[in-house]
Regions:
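Transition segment at domain starts
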Residues: 27, 33-35
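Short, T/G/N/S-enriched strand-turn elements that build extracellular solenoid repeat scaffolds
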Residues: 4-17, 23-28, 41-51, 62-76, ...
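Conserved mixed alpha/beta catalytic, RNA-binding, or beta-rich assembly cores of soluble enzyme
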Residues: 56, 61-62
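A short amphipathic beta-strand at an alpha->beta junction
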Residues: 81-85
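Small, basic N-terminal interaction modules of short regulatory proteins
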Residues: 1
């Protein structure tokens, strides 16, 4: 699982099975319970400074560009895995928190 906690929150977890992510208070959180597939239309609909959080996997379309993600300041959190194309792998590695791994998708 995945726990999202705002930095100024007073909430304290004493026991947890999964991954905890602390986020800035001004970040827009888009939570998805299992898996989310991200494409250009999805990114265009996100607000600036959005954290895409999935309980399991984030799957980013191969046509996504680093510019599209950085223009909106999109970050990712996944309980398991984030998958993306080689062209944005560096951006995704720097801007993701995962419970398991970040992998390059085969085209």
């Amino acid at each position: 699982g995945l726990l999202l906690k705002r930095k100024k929150s007073c909430y304290e977890m004493t026991r947890m099975n999964g991954r905890s992510v602390e986020v800035e208070d001004n970040v827009v959180i888009k939570p998805y319970p299992n898996t989310i597939e991200i494409d250009g239309d999805t990114v265009r609909s996100f607000d600036y400074n959005t954290l895409v959080a999935a309980g399991n996997n984030v799957d980013i379309d191969n046509n996504m560009t680093e510019q599209m993600l950085s223009d909106k300041k999109i970050t990712f959190a996944a309980g398991n895995e984030v998958k993306c194309g080689k062209n944005i792998l560096g951006y995704v590695k720097v801007n993701s928190t995962v419970g398991n791994k970040i992998t390059e998708k085969n085209e």
